[in-house]
Amino acid sequence: MFLMNILCLIIPILLAMAFLTLVERKILGYMQLRKGPNVVGPYGLLQPIADAIKLFIKEPLRPLTSSKTMFILAPTLAFSLALSMWIPMPMPHPLVNLNLGVLFILALSSLAVYSILWSGWASNSKYALIGALRAVAQTISYEVTLAIILLSIMMLNGSFTLSTLTTTQEHLWLIFPLWPLAMMWFISTLAETNRAPFDLTEGESELVSGFNVEYAAGPFALFFMAEYTNIIMMNALTTILFLGALHNPLFPELFTVNFVTKTLLLTVTFLWVRASYPRFRYDQLMHLLWKSFLPLTLALCMLHVSTPTMLAGIPPHM
């Protein structure tokens, strides 16, 4: 039965991830006044299936000097972690209702750094290694602000369980009182998932394709799938944290529809940002975090710790 639950969680995620690639290409196409994929199937709807078949039947070549075990292990780890992060997500019922769901997601997103580092190191290519080092520095840096923002929200929530956030936001979405944090959170999620304008790891002019430059066929597809699964996961988390979906215990379907709609809108915003903004310079990326976001999030975190205490509005279970 539990295996069935896991399959019911993973299959919709994989389908959503497959069609997100199509949605991205369509949106970018229409924003550049062209059609996007429209040959495979009606309106190009079968394009993701064609892409998957093409990638998985190709021969998985690897460089002669690469480290074989790590080269295969890195993409597998990346994709496994991307799927594991969905375990504590309330939609409206999580697969496993963890007490420290937020901490679990943070820990797994930190582990994803290893898959990037290993892939760059195992490829034995200078481009892949430089791309991996950039990606690791960027991911670790932006995780600092993500953790502090999450801490502020958990102070207001009174618990590290994601499910209680729906109760917290019954009367007011947290995006209204916490809009500065929401803005910084959204920008940090863009950087965390290596998306434009923060896709420094894939600087075509200097690094070809970044840490996955030596990958082809199946292993490359796993990295690709991990990236898009992470994008949907981050937007789902943003929805839970800031745009608390309507939860009526009598009609749990309403929660799911509400949740999916908000996540979809946020994902389209991700793609819109990609179509609109040029890439940052690497020093600007780091300055934005360490000189702007970190002091601001720390100040706001102190505010959110002190205000409830000052007004004696401490959550009862703390």
UniProtKB/Swiss-Prot annotation:
Transmembrane segments: 2-22, 70-90, 100-120, 136-156, 171-191, 231-251, 253-273, 294-314
UniProt catalytic activity: a ubiquinone + NADH + 5 H(+)(in) = a ubiquinol + NAD(+) + 4 H(+)(out)
Keywords annotated in UniProt: Electron transport, Membrane, Mitochondrion, Mitochondrion inner membrane, NAD, Respiratory chain, Translocase, Transmembrane, Transmembrane helix, Transport, Ubiquinone
Broad EC category: translocase
Main location: mitochondrion
Keyword Plastid set for record: no
GO biological process: aerobic respiration
Membrane disposition: Multi-pass membrane protein
UniProt GO molecular function: NADH dehydrogenase (ubiquinone) activity
GO cellular component: mitochondrial inner membrane
EC number: 7.1.1.2
Compartments (UniProt record): Mitochondrion inner membrane
Family assignment from sequence similarity: Belongs to the complex I subunit 1 family.
HAMAP family: NDH1_NuoH
Described purpose of this protein according to its UniProt entry: Core subunit of the mitochondrial membrane respiratory chain NADH dehydrogenase (Complex I) that is believed to belong to the minimal assembly required for catalysis. Complex I functions in the transfer of electrons from NADH to the respiratory chain. The immediate electron acceptor for the enzyme is believed to be ubiquinone.
Protein name: NADH-ubiquinone oxidoreductase chain 1
Organism the protein comes from: Priodontes maximus
Gene name of this polypeptide: MT-ND1
